[in-house]
Structures are given as structure tokens and as C-alpha cells.
Curated annotation (Swiss-Prot):
Signal peptide: none annotated. This is Dihydroorotate dehydrogenase (quinone). It comes from Pseudomonas savastanoi pv. phaseolicola (strain 1448A / Race 6) (Pseudomonas syringae pv. phaseolicola (strain 1448A / Race 6)). GO terms for biological process: 'de novo' pyrimidine nucleobase biosynthetic process; 'de novo' UMP biosynthetic process. It catalyses: (S)-dihydroorotate + a quinone = orotate + a quinol. Pathway: Pyrimidine metabolism; UMP biosynthesis via de novo pathway; orotate from (S)-dihydroorotate (quinone route): step 1/1.
């Protein structure tokens, strides 16, 4: 069924297709119909960040920026759903066109630029949703907020989403907001993490529960830079790391239509680069901090490869666009087939 739907959707522009798909998934969720689209994955519970996940395969942030279809995505069988990236104030993002399909490479290039309706709108949608499973909320800074004041935006968002999230992801790795990736390094990272940790402690006391914080990093770092990030995450008491966001590299899409468009590349071409980051992180973290792997999962075996590399959970986005809901079950089954000692 999804193959037919994809053929029709791919005749539309990528952003129109995205918006229509989101509307349909949202409507299906409200009517309770989405469970009919694919067989529910087997139960494969896993405990990560002190949370109990029904299975380790989640929806990556970016597909549902405003929380418009939380119930719909949950009904498809995801073990957890991450929405956002959301910013303190609404913003339109970059000019269109800003999403490009590269079907021969099972890839997507986007330069969306954190287009969203703002954190207050997102919170209202979360409150209206029926879903009571694991919900991640991904937060970022507004385009016109100077990088030097980015911490203010993250703290505003953290304050507002804290009571409504199972965990919060701090996005410092989108390539489509100028200067954002500089927050991954050196004193900028340490100052941000320190501020987040202090605010997390305050909010824990205020709300009576500790909401884990995950940091989402880019795939375009050297091993040495990745090790430094890992050390900073441990030192600051963060709860998880998500590896990775999209890449600025164009390896694997050279010469393809739209292959030279500006923006972040996701899908199959980022798989090896992302998995390498997971391996480096796993070696440095040595189990002290869980890894959530994202990047290039287009088949179930790719999810298993991420787990084998050291991840505890995986997320899909571009693979979901190309393969549909069946990829969720396929990924859960592939992980379930791994020897327990490996997963």
C-alpha cells in the first residue's frame, strides 16, 4: 500500500508531499486508523535514560516539527516519537524550495532552517494529544538570536517543554542555522551544557521528576572532536547523545540531480559516517552515557548495525520517507534477531 502512496506523493514537490503526509498521518491518528497501515512490531522493551521503551526504534525529529501528528505516528508502531525542532518564537525558516529528494541514493537534502510555530504552539498540541508513550521534544534557537545568546533560547524552550516531555533533545548540530554548530565545541559547548544542567536541576525540584537531556551532534566531526564532545557530555552530567544529524558532505550523491543543493544531507549516504561516530562515542563513553543512533537506516539490518556499533536506541526519518511504516517493524525484528549479548 505504501509503495502506491509513495508513487503518488513523489509526484508532488517534496514539501507539499511532506505537509500532505503529515495531515494524513495526523487524521489517521485521530480516527485510530494508522494501526491498519502496518503490522505492529514485536515487543522488544529496553530501558534507557531511566525510561522504559516498548521497542528501540523511534521517529527522529524534523518530520513532525510542531507536534501535529503525535498520535498518528505513535499508532504506526514507533517505540518513541521525537518532535521538533522547536524554537522560542515562531519562524518561517529558509525560502522555498528547501527540500530535495535524491531517490537514486535514497537521500534527502534539506535546508528548512527550523521552520516552526513556536514552543507555545507545540506545547498546546502535546497537551491535546492522547499519546502517553515516550515523547522526545527537540529544542533549538531562533534564527535571529545571536549565537552568543543561544543559551537563552534553549533555556526558554526547556522551561516550557519540561513538564510535557519524556526527554528533551538539545539540537546544536543543524547545518541550516548559521553558527549553530559552533556550539558543539570548546567553551561554547561547556557553557551551554553547564547552563542546561543547572536548569535541569532546578526544574527537577520544581516538577518533582527528572527529565533526561540528550545532545544531538553532527556527523562532520573528526574522531578527536567527537572524543572531546563525549568527555564534555560526561563531565556535565548529560543523559544521552544522539548521533547524528545531517551531513554537509556530498559523498555518494556527486553528479545526481539536486546533489549540489545547499543544506544537510540525510539518508543512505550518511550511514557509514554516522555509524562511525557511534563507534567512536561508544569507545569513549564506555557505557557511561547511552547513544541514540540516527542516520541512514533504510533497511532493518542497518538498525541492527547501529546497535552493534554501540547504540541503545535508533531513530529513522529519511528511511521512513522511502520505505514507509514497514521499516519500523523490519528494524525491530532485525534488532530482536541479534544475540542478547550484543544488543
Amino acid at each position: 500500500m505504501y509503495n502506491l502512496a509513495r508513487q503518488l506523493l513523489f509526484k508532488l514537490s517534496p514539501e507539499t508531499s511532506h505537509d500532505l503526509s503529515l495531515d494524513l498521518i495526523g487524521a489517521g491518528g485521530r480516527l485510530g486508523l494508522n494501526g491498519l497501515l502496518s503490522k505492529s512490531p514485536a515487543k522488544l522493551p529496553v530501558s534507557v535514560m531511566g525510561l522504559e521503551f516498548p521497542n528501540p526504534v523511534g521517529l527522529a525529529a524534523g518530520l513532525d516539527k510542531n507536534g501535529a501528528a503525535i498520535d498518528g505516528f505513535a499508532q504506526l508502531g514507533f517505540g518513541f516519537v521525537e518532535i521538533g525542532t522547536v524554537t522560542p518564537r515562531p519562524q518561517p525558516g529558509n525560502p522555498k524550495p528547501r527540500i530535495f529528494r535524491l531517490p537514486h541514493a535514497e537521500a534527502i537534502i534539506n535546508r528548512m532552517g527550523f521552520n516552526n510555530l513556536g514552543v507555545d504552539n507545540l506545547v498546546s498540541r502535546v497537551q491535546a494529544a492522547k499519546y502517553r508513550g515516550i515523547l522526545g521534544i527537540n529544542i533549538g534557537k531562533n534564527f535571529d538570536t545571536p549565537v552568543e545568546r543561544a543559551v537563552d533560547d534553549y533555556l526558554i524552550c526547556l522551561d516550557k517543554v519540561y513538564a510535557h516531555a519524556s526527554y528533551v533533545t538539545v539540537n546544536v548540530s543543524s547545518p541550516n542555522t548559521p553558527g549553530l554548530r559552533s556550539l558543539q565545541f570548546g567553551d561554547s559547548l561547556k557553557q551551554l551544557l553547564q547552563a542546561l544542567s543547572l536548569r535541569q536541576q532546578e526544574l527537577t525540584q520544581r516538577h518533582g521528576r527528572r527529565v533526561p537531556l540528550a545532545i544531538k551532534i553532527a556527523p562532520d566531526m573528526s574522531d578527536e572532536e567527537t572524543v572531546l564532545v563525549a568527555s564534555a557530555l560526561i563531565e556535565s552530567g548529560m543523559d544521552a547523545v544522539i548521533a547524528t544529524n545531517t551531513t554537509l558532505s556530498r559523498q555518494g550523491v556527486e553528479g545526481l540531480p539536486h546533489g549540489d543543493e545547499a543544506g544537510g544531507l540525510s539518508g543512505a549516504p550518511v550511514r557509514e559516517k554516522s555509524t562511525h561516530i557511534v563507534k567512536v562515542l561508544a569507545g569513549e563513553l564506555a557505557g557511561r552515557l547511552p547513544i541514540i543512533a540516527a542516520g541512514g537506516i533504510t533497511e532493518g539490518r542497518h538498525a541492527a548495525e547501529k546497535i552493534a556499533a554501540g547504540a541503545s536506541l535508533v531513530q529513522i526519518y529519511s528511511g521512513f520517507i522511502y520505505k514507509g511504516p514497514a521499516l519500523i517493524r523490519e528494524s525491530v525484528d532485525a534488532i530482536a534477531a541479534m544475540p542478547p549479548a550484543v544488543r
